[in-house]
Swiss-Prot record:
Name the record gives this protein: Argininosuccinate lyase
Signal peptide: none
Pathway field: Amino-acid biosynthesis; L-arginine biosynthesis; L-arginine from L-ornithine and carbamoyl phosphate: step 3/3
Biological process according to GO: arginine biosynthetic process via ornithine; L-arginine biosynthetic process
Catalysis: reaction(s): 2-(N(omega)-L-arginino)succinate = fumarate + L-arginine
Subcellular location: Cytoplasm
UniProt keyword Lyase, yes or no: yes
Region entry Disordered, spans: 462-489
Keyword entries, A-Z: Amino-acid biosynthesis, Arginine biosynthesis, Cytoplasm, Lyase
HAMAP family: Arg_succ_lyase (MF_00006)
InterPro entries from the UniProt entry: Arg_succ_lyase_C (IPR029419), Argininosuccinate_lyase (IPR009049), Fumarase/histidase_N (IPR024083), Fumarate_lyase_CS (IPR020557), Fumarate_lyase_fam (IPR000362), Fumarate_lyase_N (IPR022761), L-Aspartase-like (IPR008948)
Primary localisation category: cytoplasm
Originating organism: Synechococcus sp. (strain JA-3-3Ab)
UniProt superkingdom: Bacteria
Length: 489
């Protein structure tokens, strides 16, 4: 019988195995190619962990200090961009450990005392996502600011409002822009709620059942800036709800950016002509020399699908997993990283485009309002104010519009005698009532498009914007004994 051969490359679990892992299986199994992005967070988590091990007497002060110095050297290498993971390391955790052992010797192998890669990666992911949420919220804040600046310039610019992509009623352009600011404000708030769910420390949960060593999880959570510690070790290592919530929040951000992109694409067509693209944010055709294409907007619209896909992929991955950790969860990272990158890129591109890439064609917008029947509702409202039931008024105005369409004229072209032939309630003041600018100004109900109401809404939005200006992130709490952080409730 052949004698078993020892593994050629020691792995963090190789003691159980007599033979070597097939090299292609090793490559298939490895995640170092993408989870290296978690490197600074893995080092930060390890620094907090070793400080706790020393404070609890699980490691001697000398051992903890040696490991700390080694980790700080790795941290420096990461910051300088010179850290090179061992090519044999299967993941970011083992890459850090192998470098640590190379720096400080065998004592480095004590770093993993009292933890598992299961709670380690869960901690890394939460630290990473917490930072990225802050970055995305900052980008949302900046885009909201651009929308508010544009809205402040166009309170009294009017254009057709649409339902079913058919002209419906005239509105203020600022009102339209503020609608998108409202969407992004909700996105900003939503990500704040997701951050609260992310800000829970799972470190110390072990592989699934905790540890018999006298660790201090509250100290680790305090050092890493977490609000609380997880309550159940099984749940802590297998929970990816917060990733689903982030993907869902990211998907809604892209829904809103995609809707805005679609409208601007339409507005930039010759058929609409409401927007002109500047050279800074448009591209051309390799064949047709006259073209000026809205590629930035089309890419934002197109990238939305991949973000939706990552949400669906994660849900499908999670739906059949028994407790606790399963290797399937390795698949949670690439989609997350891509979603983070995509959302940030789209927010940046849209901010630049709205600031530098479009010019509103206000004369064309206002001319369009003069060319349609979007003031028909105001004729019905006029009759209602004269005491005529709305349904009767609605029916009558429909007949008037039908007559005008048949004759190729607009409501403003009807002389007063023709108005009176439809109903004796019409007087000279009907012409003021159907003037598009007056139509918009009259919409004074709360949340409406009336100029006065829009100015008030803009002031509220600007005040809200200033109140939510992102502050510089505070440093992590100083080293201290356990702070009595509560369990997750």
């Amino acid at each position: 019988m052949a004698k078993p051969t020892a593994p050629s490359t020691p792995r963090p679990w190789s003691g159980r195995f007599a033979g070597s892992l097939h090299p292609r299986i090793a490559r298939f199994n490895a995640s170092i190619g993408f989870d290296i992005r978690l490197l600074p967070y893995d080092v930060a988590g390890s620094l907090a962990h070793v400080q706790m091990l020393g404070a609890c007497g699980i490691l001697s002060r000398e051992e903890a200090e040696q490991i700390r110095q080694g980790l700080e050297q790795i941290e420096k290498e990461v910051a300088e961009g010179i850290f090179q993971p061992d090519p044999e390391a299967e993941d970011v955790h083992y890459a850090v450990e192998r470098r640590l052992v190379a720096l400080v010797g065998e004592v480095g192998k004590k770093l993993h005392t009292g933890r598992s890669r299961n709670d380690q990666v869960a901690t890394d992911l939460r630290l990473y996502l917490r930072d990225e949420i802050d970055t995305i919220r900052q980008a949302l804040w900046e885009l909201r600011g651009v929308l508010l600046d544009l809205a402040s310039q166009h309170v009294e610019t009017i254009l057709p409002g649409y339902t079913h992509l058919q002209r419906a009623q005239p509105i203020s352009l600022a009102h339209h822009l503020l609608a998108y600011e409202e969407m992004l404000w909700r996105d900003w708030q939503r990500l704040g709620r997701v951050r609260e769910e992310v800000n829970v420390c799972p470190l110390g949960s072990g592989a699934l059942a905790g540890t018999s060593l006298p660790i201090d999880r509250q100290l680790v959570a305090h050092l890493l800036g977490f609000e609380r510690i997880s309550a159940n070790s099984l749940d802590a290592v297998s929970d990816r709800d917060y990733l689903v919530e982030f993907h869902a929040a990211a998907s809604l951000i892209l829904v809103h950016l995609s809707r805005l992109s679609e409208e601007l694409i339409l507005w930039a067509t010759q058929e609409f002509g409401f927007v002109a693209l500047t050279d800074a944010c448009a591209t051309g055709s390799s064949l047709m020399p006259q073209k000026k294409n809205p590629d930035v907007l089309e890419l934002v619209r197109g990238k939305t699908g991949r973000v939706f896909g990552h949400l669906q992929a994660l849900l499908v991955t999670l739906k059949g997993l028994p407790l606790a950790y399963n290797k399937d969860l390795q698949e949670d990272k690439e989609g997350l990283f891509d979603t983070v990158d995509t959302v940030k890129a789209c927010l940046e591109a849209m901010t630049i485009l709205l600031r530098e890439g479009i010019q509103f064609q206000t004369q064309r917008m206002e001319a369009a309002v003069q060319e349609d029947f979007s003031n028909a509702t105001d004729v019905a409202d006029y009759l209602v104010r004269k005491g005529i039931p709305f349904r009767a008024a609605h029916d009558l105005v429909g007949q008037i519009v039908r007559t005008c369409v048949a004759e190729g004229i607009l409501l403003k072209d009807l002389p007063l005698e023709r108005w009176k032939s439809f109903h004796r309630a019409f007087e000279e003041d009907i012409f003021a009532a159907i003037d598009p600018r007056q139509v918009v100004a009259a919409r004074l109900s709360a949340g409406g498009t009336g100029f006065a109401v829009v100015r008030e809404a803009l002031q509220r939005a600007q005040a809200r914007y200033q109140q939510t200006e992102p502050a510089e992130e505070p440093p992590l709490p100083p080293s201290s004994p356990g702070s009595g952080l509560p369990l997750e409730s």
